[in-house]
Design a protein with these regions (language model features):
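C-terminal catalytic-base region of ester-bond hydrolases, centering on the histidine
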Residues: 6, 210-289
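Flexible, membrane-associating and regulatory peripheral segments of lipid-active enzymes
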Residues: 1-105, 122-126, 133-142, 168-173, ...
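Serine-dependent carboxylesterase/thioesterase catalytic core
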Residues: 73, 77-84, 88-232
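Residue-level detector of functional hotspots within protein domains
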Residues: 59, 65, 87, 161, ...
Length: 289
């Protein structure tokens, strides 16, 4: 029997083609992931060099009075204090939400910040007081405009502390956590009373190295040796502990593998504030009235 006359195994060519497609897709995914990591690493090195050369470390985008008339979204970086993650959040929001988008720089500059930014509770509460006053001044000048806070990683601490300091008659609209470093058992009732729409918490079980092991060893932003809300989400209290049903305003979104293809979010800590993720999932909630 000639080779061409041999019976072909059913589906063999399709199986090979499917296998090639899967490998090609996997390689493209990995290339995107590595490009993201290289870009972030390069920008952090650039920031460090700027500090060594005595150049400004913090940079702020200019906002117009017309933007401020429409609302204000404040972005809090993580314990790195500034850099590509904060810039990614701003870029993801600026083109997708109404009003001004500004970074609130609360941390000690890179590289000496990091752990002190996570662990120095007194300083973080002082920065939270500054943030609360900034919000009140904005509300005095632009009453009735929407105000939101978006906090990444360790920025979740100063963010929620600031909300808790607001008078009950001076609520803001919403608070967003991206890979937040607050303990998963934190009592949110004080903050939820001061939020119209509530808290939007994005979390990922893949973030267990930083927000599981890391926060268990070094503590969360609220100084608990505990797994963080950015890894497992916030734990809801019993009904008896929440008679006002405030936790109805806690909205939680869990990472899922489909987000890799959807917006390049791999679920680990370095992707918790990615620009595409913020634009597609955070911005619509902020824009919603």
């Amino acid at each position: 029997m000639l080779y061409s006359q041999w019976p072909e195994r059913s589906g063999s060519r399709k199986d090979i083609a499917d296998g090639v497609a899967v490998r090609t897709k996997s390689m493209a995914r990995m290339a995107q992931k590595l490009a993201h990591i290289r870009k972030a690493r390069g920008e952090f090195v650039s920031l460090l060099l700027q500090r060594l050369r005595g150049k400004p470390f913090f940079r702020q985008t200019m906002v117009s009075a017309a933007d401020l008339e429409q609302g204000l979204t404040l972005v809090l970086p993580g314990i790195e204090a500034a850099g590509p993650f904060a810039d990614a959040m701003v870029n993801g929001l600026a083109s997708a939400v109404p009003g001004a988008v500004q970074i609130f720089y609360w941390g000690i500059p890179f590289p000496e910040g990091y752990l002190p930014n996570l662990m120095w509770l007194r300083r973080n509460r002082a920065k939270a007081a500054e943030l609360a006053q900034m919000i009140l001044r904005y509300q005095d000048r632009y009453p009735g405009r929407p105000v939101h806070i978006v906090a990444n990683s360790g920025g979740a601490g100063p963010a929620i502390f600031a909300v808790e300091l607001l008078p009950l008659d001076r609520k803001i609209d919403g608070l967003v956590f991206l890979g937040g470093a607050i303990s998963s058992t934190y009592d949110l009732r004080g903050a939820l009373r001061r939020l119209e729409k509530g808290i939007f918490n994005f979390y990922s079980h893949r973030d267990w190295i930083v927000l599981g092991v890391g926060t268990s060893l070094f503590g969360t932003s609220d100084r608990k040796p505990h797994i963080a809300c950015g890894c497992v989400g916030f734990k809801r209290p019993t009904t008896n502990a929440d008679p006002e049903n405030l936790y109805a305003k806690l909205h939680q979104v869990k990472w899922k593998p489909a987000l890799i293809d959807d917006c390049g979010h791999w679920g680990t800590h370095g992707f918790s504030a990615s620009e595409r993720y913020v634009r597609q999932y955070v911005a619509p909630w902020i824009a919603k009235k």
